[in-house]
Amino acid sequence: MKQRVHTRTWSSPGLAGRRPHLLVEDSRPALAISDFSLFQDAGFDVAFCRGPDSDPGACPLLRGQQCMLVAGADVVLHGLEPGLGVAAAIRRHRPELPVVIKQPRQEHGTAYPVPAGCVPLAYSCSVGGQIDALLRAEATARHAAAAGSGPEDASSPRAPL
């Protein structure tokens, strides 16, 4: 597998106990060297994946295989190119997993469509807004799982967070 993964998988240095696992997916090079301290301060263990770049075959999900990072995640912040289909593949493999999507604008100014079951992020430029959306999505999924709801219930709030 040619998966590109940050070397500090599920890292929260010096913190005890199980914290929600956040998978950040983004192809921007600057994020590959980020320490993600704001997400860690908000209570998440963080892993990072750069995605398949220009080779969709480099992503195990797009080949119909399991991705170990997605398997271990409690919530995903998805910022990869919408046309790759990674967000939809995540939902096919783990329909109960909340996927919060940054929505880039198309050339004519409208947002790309959000795959079924994913939650659009209204203000992706704000880290505070991202953290708030992730915390709400993870809590909604956790409550739905505790109540015995199906995956549809856990992902039903499709309004922008």
Report the location of each language-model feature:
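Non-catalytic signal-transmission and effector/linker regions of two-component phosphorelay proteins
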Residues: M1-A47, G51, D55-V70, R91-R92, ...
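Negatively charged, flexible loop motifs adjacent to catalytic sites
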Residues: P104-G109
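Hydrophobic anchor at the start of a short beta-strand
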Residues: V46, L97-V99
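Active-site residues of response regulator receiver
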Residues: G72-E81
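Hydrophobic/aromatic residues positioned on beta-strands within the core alpha/beta folds
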Residues: H78, V100-Q103
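Hydrophobic/aromatic beta-strand patches that form the interior of the parallel beta-sheet core
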Residues: V100, V119-L121
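Residues at the ends of beta-strands that form strand-to-helix hinge/output surfaces
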Residues: H78, A122-Y123
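Short amphipathic alpha-helix used as the core "switch/output" element in two-component signaling
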Residues: P82-E96
